[in-house]
Amino acid sequence: MSKQLKTSFLDSIAQIAPAEWNKLIGSDYPFLQHEFLLSLEESACVSVRSGWKPSHLIIKNHDEKLVALMPLYLKNNSMGEYVFDWSWADAYYQHGIEYYPKYVTSVPFTPSVGPRICIAPLEDEQAVLTKIISCLQQQANSSGASSWHVLFPEKKLSDQLADLGMLQRTGCQYQWFNKNYADFESFLQSFSSRKRKNLKKERKKIQENNIQFEWLNGHEIAPEQWQSFYRFYQNTYLVRGRSAYLNLPFFLELARLMPDQILLVLAKKDDAYIAGALSFKDSNTLYGRYWGCDEEWQFLHFETCYYQGIEYCIKQGLQKFDSGAQGEHKIQRGFEPVFTFSNHWIAHPQFSAAINQFIKEENQHLSRYQKLAEKYLPYKKNENP
């Protein structure tokens, strides 16, 4: 079976038709859509210069039918990945070995779990995955890459890759789940009284400061509103002395290509926009991605990024709010700690063994951490997951 499969690497997502790529994805998960990946490339946010050289993998059968695909990048740094391997790179350097370049299967700058290897429904998944692993190992050896990393795959795929010999690493994020809440107040009723009081206090403070909010879908966002949001987004990085990963042309291109999957929350005070949060959505999930502000107000971040998103999910019937990487402060606001996964193939045998041991210890720590973190959820005891 695998001998009949032909692999090809694409220097750009533009080398495959959007309809052909999106059909095989088989879902409306926004970040793997052809339009999203194309916007990253066309805006030059993803390029050799930024450390992300596109090398997307497609597989066709003997009839030239597309049977599998995955995003793939040859990387010369670890920026914008959110699965941190800096210590691995340092260890390589200390031993006089090059860690970069490396291959990464992910969505650039996007720590969101979703499809990573898409396989046609009637294909033998085991055979296709075996072919892909073999292909990437050969490609890494011929190009001098140290490794291949699959970041934020769905658990099923991660387990399949682990069964085929790749290392499996665990991470933790915080997600909100819609338990058929009628409105925000019914969500609050699931809290213990003290936690409910605290959250109401935070929202009341925003109201007392006369801060109001607008929800805008992609086609409703005016150019000047995009300018305001992008200024906020840049501020988030500038306060840390860094430049933003993404540029304004990227966002404008997304608004043109996939407006129905964009939600912009803007905060306004005295007729001026002061903060904003940009999210993406599919039929099931809201994905919180970017935030920033011009003015600092108490609890403004929580309201703009979390409470407005929760309200939107309840009103639109979305089942999950994926709020992105990090942020333990989300726990007491109703976001549950959930495991994320990544898979790794390391070419160097000794380093592979050492990293495997590192991952085992890290996974044990995260398992203990999740159990501890769940104790701090605000829900009444009988509401706890």
Sequence positions of predicted segments:
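N-acyltransferase acceptor-side catalytic subdomain
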Residues: 1-385
